[in-house]
Amino acid sequence: MQSFLQEVAADLYRRYGEDVSSLHILFPTRRARHFFIDALSHLAERPMWQPRWLTIDDLMQEVSGLHSGERIRLIAELYKVYSACHDEPFDKFYFWGEMLLNDFDTIDKYRVDADALFRNIYELKELESDVSYLTAEQLEVIRQFWANFTDGATLSEEKRRFLAVWRTLGDVYHGFRARLQRQGIAYGGMMQRAAAERLLAGDFAFAERRRYVVAGFNALSACEKVLFRFLQHNAETDFYWDYDDYYLKNTDQEAGMFVRENHASFPPVVELSHDNFRKEKELTVVSTPSNAVQCKYAGRILDALRTGADGRKRPLDKETAVVLTDENLLLPLLHALPEEAGGINVTMGYPIKTTLAYAFLERLVELQAHRREGREGTSFYHVDAAGILAHPYVARSAPQTIEQLRRTMLADRRIRMTADELGQTPLLKTLFTPAAEWRELSDYLLRAVAAVAREPYDGDDARQRVEFLAVISEQLIRLRNSLEACDIEITTSIYTSLLRRHLQTVRIPFEGEPLEGLQVMGILETRNLDFRNVVLLSMNDDNFPGNRVAQASFIPYNLRAAFDLPTPAHHEGVYAYYFYRLVQRAERVYMLYCAHADEKTTGEQSHYIYQLDFETGFRLKRVEVGVDVNLAENPPIEVAKEGDVWEKLSRFVDPESPAMLSPTAFFRYVACPLRFYFYSVARLKADDDLTEEVDAPMFG
């Protein structure tokens, strides 16, 4: 198998030799660079300089002269413009302000006439604004959603306020762009549009002669097409397209939707191999009852791939990839990989939201959210306090003190405990300090994280603990700086919401060599890369391709289609290309899906699997995996009636002994002798739960 990047490297080296180092190369992903350099290193006869690497964003920024702004700051600037037209607090604006920013971004990337689009939206909403048929309950939902309606508003007033939002979208859009332009920052779409307009006006030229290589792109926005035309006519540019004739020449195949246009508009400098779908492939479809079984079975597949023709096991190399269409399966998959698999390169990073450090931060946030101020000072809710005390980062710091606090809480039935009662050590005093305003909460979280990081810790995850806490501390500072740059007052609740949303997207990169061992990656990272063996997980139709076109948008579907904005059909074409491009050079492809249907999934395999089965002529091997119900037997617990045990039992039948069997103990003995032993002989009792209501045992 010769990969796409190997073919590109071979052609460039054949044509330019060591002058390849003078080229400016654009790939869709940064990871493609590593594989390209590896391919080039096998061709070069002596050491040479690398080519110059660029991304589309780098070029757009160079041409436009604008810089990308932090997302939180962009939404804050959008709010300042929006609030001039509508009286709405930032807390309520933020989350649908994100939706508005996404729409503006899409409008600019596709160079849509914003005034015409917003005028159409307003007219469409005016037709839809007759609310006379709505029930009182439905009207109440509308009032709560917009937060603009008052209980005493008339129907016509509701209609007026409803339409006012849509009428001002154009003004907000233009005002927002002008405000950002004055500050020299932009969102992605605005930067692309500014660059495209400058190129079309002839106001930009490169300061020096450049030769570009554009390789492996697929779906292009209108602004990106303008950039590529500029490179085509104003710089020496070589285009390479990664496709197969199977879907390029078949106009009914959605995988070729974009590459057909690209191939015609930007002809390739040379034709590479495009007949890989004619080659023999081993395609296997695996139906599993759960995601956990998917991961386990993927481990078995990888173990089988390690076995060579001579029967010996060998480590897996970069020719094998596990592709996660649902990145939530990363951790279960890592636990299911065979220990002898060799090196593993994970491209997606470790999600911070699954770490103990993030759980600790959540405990702190909940602790402050439920605190109360009273005559005795600040008090904390027992559930939050107990959670902090039980967390591994805290429990090992002063085990005796913490155990005594826990016992006091249970024995005295303390629903709330004061900060003075809980702050028995320097660490606990730091953790149980009140923080009201959002800046105080931010400072408090930073102090708490730093205090925990300084504590001695002898757990197996000591190194990871410090790294995770350092990442959280860094993200807290970044969020604080972004919010202060916005110059907008927010509530503590909106701060905690922003903090959660921010941290849940943070991933910690794994350390490793990208060109060694098994490759574990998401579907987007596979662009331009080819593998001999591919294992695809979560190949359910509602997940892959699914429907990732944002449902929350001000732009309805019919107007998206009319103005050539991305629609579900666009999304379908993009993901069909990802799939078929990944399969085209592979020799073995395993497609696993969960056949279990519930409220979240239909259990249906991806329609791409059906297409392979009925349209390509390949024979698909199908495997159904069940659940192993042969559970390991637990040995029975037996306690011999001898020695000390017999002496304790004899007390209950000795007429001179004060020990007696209560009715409850006798019933327990009849129901389960072992339970009787634990309660009445060994005196083992579970800790009482701290209840907030008077239950039957407490009432008597």
Regions found by a protein language model. Give the residues of each.
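Nucleic acid-machinery interaction/catalytic patches
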Residues: M1-N558, G617-R622, D688, E692, ...
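C-terminal, charged and often intrinsically disordered regions of DNA end-processing helicases
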Residues: H24, L302, R306, Y610-G700
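Generic structural signal for residues positioned in beta-strands
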Residues: D238, T284, G343, F360, ...
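Hydrophobic, well-ordered secondary-structure elements that form the walls
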Residues: N528, L582, C672
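Short, surface-exposed beta-strand-loop junctions and turns on beta-sheet-rich folds
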Residues: N540-N543, A597-E599, R683-K685
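Active-site rim segments in enzyme catalytic domains, especially the processed small/beta chain
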Residues: A552-P568, R581
